[in-house]
């Protein structure tokens, strides 16, 4: 006597497929769901409170408050914005130093230009800008907080931002005893200090993303 194979009812098969499709759609909607709207006052307060954890809180507030609407209350977006601010300042400063940061009369006399300590400093700050932009880009690829990928990428950002801060410090050291006719050395140093402070603040905000940093 032949044995008849029993096939699952068509209805059950349909329900299984429908359930799988529903789960897939739900997961996709959660991953693409926009962040809840944050009021301007709440976003500004978040920036203000977050900046208290930095070494230069007033500098932090002034530079990041314009980013508050885009940041909302996201520590990750705030750190990313701070890295971009640091990179922009490094680019501006390296361009200024690359021109010698001197008056036209001193350039004609050979006091300006990219030679010596100023030129080395400009090159160093270009390295700092590259590291900070690389760090900001890495922040976009970090993934879910607490995951191995997050920890790995966060470690990269911490390493690169720390190196950028070292670059700024090296530049300041090279200008400590620098002097040239017609060159406003104080103006040079102030610009480099601005880079150093912005980078220090960015690194502090990045470190706040590390759960081990609070232990």
PLM regions: where:
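Cleavable N-terminal signal peptides of Sec/SRP-targeted secreted and luminal proteins
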Residues: 7-24
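Folded extracytoplasmic luminal domains of secretory or organellar precursors
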Residues: 2-3, 28-215
